[in-house]
């Protein structure tokens, strides 16, 4: 298994998990850009955001990803937060497994 996030999901690599359910896992970023910086990762491997089909199923999966990001922010007690997705290499994506950055904890 080459994907670092798939290896974290499989328990092969350590992480500081803050949330997990049947479809997603969330853990602290190893190179945080904010006082609180968590990655929300679907357990299903999809390389980049644009790989989700423009169908009802794709919309359902993307909706679940962002609902989970909101849920994670609440679990962390963030009063305000930023959500960021880097789509593809030219969009700044470094790990090619869809993930959402939830960043907060300022001030």
Give names to the regions the model predicted.
Residues 1-107:
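HIT superfamily nucleotide-processing domains
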């Amino acid at each position: 298994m080459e994907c670092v996030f798939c290896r974290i999901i499989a328990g092969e690599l350590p992480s500081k998990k803050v949330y997990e359910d049947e479809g997603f896992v969330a853990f602290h970023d190893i190179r945080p850009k904010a006082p609180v910086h968590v990655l929300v990762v679907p357990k299903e491997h999809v390389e980049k955001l644009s790989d989700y089909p423009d169908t009802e199923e794709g919309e359902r999966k993307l909706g679940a990803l962002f609902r989970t990001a909101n849920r994670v922010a609440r679990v962390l007690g963030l009063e305000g937060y930023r959500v960021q997705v880097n789509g593809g290499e030219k969009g700044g994506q470094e790990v090619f497994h869809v993930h959402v950055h939830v960043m907060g904890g300022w001030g």
